[in-house]
Amino acid sequence: MATSLIPMRSHQYKMPGGRRTGTAATAYTVGMMRVEIPTNEPLPAGPLEDYRKLDDTALASRIDEVRQRLGSRVLILGHHYQQDGVIAHADLRGDSYQLSKSAAERTDCEAIVFCGVHFMAETADILVNRPEQIAGRNGSRVNVVLPDTAAGCSMADMAAIEQVEDAWADLGEIIDTDDITPVTYINSAASLKAFCGRHGGIVCTSSNARAVLEWAFARTKRVLFFPDQHLGRNTANSMGVPLEQMCVWNPHDPRLGGNDATTLEKSRVILWQGHCSVHAMFRPEHVDTMRENLPGVKILVHPECAMEVVEKSDLAGSTSYIINQIEAAAPGTSWAIGTELHLVRRLEQEHPEQNIRFLSPTVCMCATMYRIDLAHLCWSLEHLESGNPVNVICVDQDTAHWSVVALERMLDVTAFKQG
């Protein structure tokens, strides 16, 4: 008889407010490109020590064996930015929301291992363990496991719930907050999604950000957009919102986020001072250099890049958009892509009929995503099999409820636009 993956007890972790999201980096050269590979800090002697002694071939073999024994009871989700050795074991590959949504539609799994970062595992837990779904499983929760709880997101960490609540209170001294819609990028903590749910706000993805802002502006005069200023600015700019009607809120400046009352009153979009550390590495001069060296190249970037980069590019869109553009392009098309290196290199390998380049000559890959390695994946799977899961991400009921409210508003907006 198969062992149930629903444990008598489990080790549940909450990421501390000051969680560490950076690691040391080792530089090496791939062709003409200098690459900085984040290096996991040495682990103290502990549960992973024996796994660290194994090479990748041995780890992959053990992962395959435990997967075969667990069968459909466990679902492995792999984000596009994962390293190839990890993504090879994923049942589903995609962006953060796409993976969580797909997982919520599965009815046969007892546990999910999310090879991504902390906020992604939170979103999966929220969507997979909604009350009606738990009821449909006779009260059983699906454990969502993050192989390494140190896999956070520096951008998500740039907007703590306490900072957002303080900003909201400060804005209320100048502007009627009933006339502000809070919008959080899905790349954020569950507490921020819940904040938006409570305050009439909404979640967005990089795919539907424009539709979400259109919805928000139909309801209120202003938007507070967090945590990624670049996605907010690029989206608002594409909608024709003048730059002088956008301001940046610095959560570390106690003086109205570094603004005065007049600036806030004339602003339609209040952008949180946050950014993706990977996409911030791409610079306008990278676009110029690529066009000089490769005439006819198409520049394709993610909207988390700075506006100056997006405006110089030919195309900008979400991870799924980038993949779809490459898949639909004619053989022989030349591309320079500005997004996370693992994805770009994978596209290059999967589409040898096209000439795909990485936009930047030097980049640091997503350090925290890189923490999910074969050792952590094997360790977490074998603990699931033993009935003693580790690193279970569990969002509290109230936060999950209000997060779902904000997420469902997003789904309604997207469905209306597509209908």
Show which residues each predicted segment covers:
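Active-site loop-to-helix "anion-binding N-cap" substructures in soluble metabolic enzymes
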Residues: 2-337, 343-419
